[in-house]
């Protein structure tokens, strides 16, 4: 990608975030084009893509035959097919898996590093973009296309926008916003995704979890009414037989070091500590607070105390902006 990522600043929680323009270099874009695109994706991901309109984007999982996620994808219609955004660390293996049956279909599946991914969030983000685009996405119309640019709208943790565009437009946006917006890299967007409870699947956790263990059903990412897709039997069993005992949680507090993706944490049990969970992502905010996204048992007590392994500091459960009730 020729567009240079912005230098990192310590991320800020959404409630205190000034207007910020971010380069999303830790995320990556991929596309499927061709006459069979919709049919092909319908057989590969958990969401019902046949029901998607041009004005929607949705979270979906791409699973293996056992229902474990290679990756989760932020999907939207693009040209005569679809595009999706996922963590850069999983794109190559995810595309390798997705292409396995493509030889029998009229599709072309490819990474897209020509386009640039930007995020805009923080104080009066909508007003800042309203001067630059003739229409902005909203709850009713979550995807808007203008020229070479696609804008995606997100409600949580506070209104924000993901921009998929060409290099020239990315440079124009940077020039226009440079004076009024802080510039940051993808760690800020990661912090917002953690706060929003959007699961972050990096390479360390690819192939480890069924979608429901990361709350995908609560985020509208699983259709239980659509036809067959890879891993469907296991995903359905988890719902209808109550086989899933895990959920994605948001923890906040202090830690002397950031836990890495794939690491476990420790849960306080009386005077002792017991290993628990799997970390998906963690970020240290500018106020010193550490936020951690972790998959753990879904019956944790709300007042449970956790820590990074052998650490002197503690973490506690924070509420997510959505309900886990089906």
Swiss-Prot record:
Q: Where does folate bind?
A: 27, 189
A Gene Ontology annotation in the biological process aspect, one of them, is:
iron-sulfur cluster assembly
| Pfam families linked | GCV_T, YgfZ_barrel
Q: Which GO molecular function, any one, fits this protein according to its record?
A: folic acid binding
Compartmental location: Cytoplasm
Q: Which InterPro entries match?
A: GCV_T_N, GcvT/YgfZ_C, tRNA-modifying_YgfZ, YgfZ/GcvT, YgfZ/GcvT_CS, YgfZ_barrel
Q: Which GO terms describe its cellular component?
A: cytoplasm
Q: Where is the signal peptide?
A: none
Q: Which UniProt keywords apply?
A: Cytoplasm, Folate-binding, tRNA processing
Q: Which family does it belong to?
A: Belongs to the tRNA-modifying YgfZ family.
Provide the protein name.
tRNA-modifying protein YgfZ
Q: Which organism is it from?
A: Shigella boydii serotype 18 (strain CDC 3083-94 / BS512)
């Amino acid at each position: 990608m020729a567009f240079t990522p912005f230098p990192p600043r310590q991320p800020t929680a959404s409630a205190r975030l000034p207007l910020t323009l971010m380069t999303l270099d830790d995320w990556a874009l991929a596309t499927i084009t061709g006459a069979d695109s919709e049919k092909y994706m319908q057989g590969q991901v958990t969401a019902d893509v046949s029901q998607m309109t041009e004005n929607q984007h949705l979270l979906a999982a791409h699973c293996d035959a056992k229902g474990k996620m290679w990756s989760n994808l932020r999907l939207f219609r693009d040209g005569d097919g679809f595009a999706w955004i996922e963590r850069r660390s999983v794109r190559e293996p995810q595309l390798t898996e997705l292409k396995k049956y493509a030889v029998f279909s009229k599709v072309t599946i490819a990474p897209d590093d020509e386009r640039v991914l930007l995020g805009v969030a923080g104080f009066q983000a909508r007003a800042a973009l309203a001067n630059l685009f003739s229409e902005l996405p909203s709850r009713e119309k979550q995807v808007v296309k203008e020229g070479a640019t696609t804008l995606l709208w997100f409600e949580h943790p506070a209104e924000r926008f993901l921009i998929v565009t060409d290099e020239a437009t990315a440079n124009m946006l940077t020039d226009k916003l440079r004076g009024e917006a802080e510039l940051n890299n993808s760690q800020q967007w990661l912090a917002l995704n953690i706060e929003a409870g959007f699961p972050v699947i990096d390479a360390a956790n690819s192939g480890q979890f069924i979608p429901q263990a990361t709350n995908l059903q609560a985020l509208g990412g699983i259709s239980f009414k659509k036809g067959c897709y890879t891993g469907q039997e296991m995903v359905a069993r988890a719902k209808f037989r109550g086989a899933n005992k895990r959920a994605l949680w948001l923890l906040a507090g202090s830690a002397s070091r950031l836990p890495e993706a794939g690491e476990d944490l420790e849960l306080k049990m009386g005077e002792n500590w017991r290993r628990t969970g799997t970390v998906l992502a963690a970020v240290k905010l500018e106020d010193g607070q550490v936020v951690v996204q972790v998959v753990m048992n879904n019956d944790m007590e709300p007042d449970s105390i956790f820590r990074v392994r052998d650490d002197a500091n503690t973490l506690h459960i924070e509420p997510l902006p959505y309900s886990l009730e089906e």
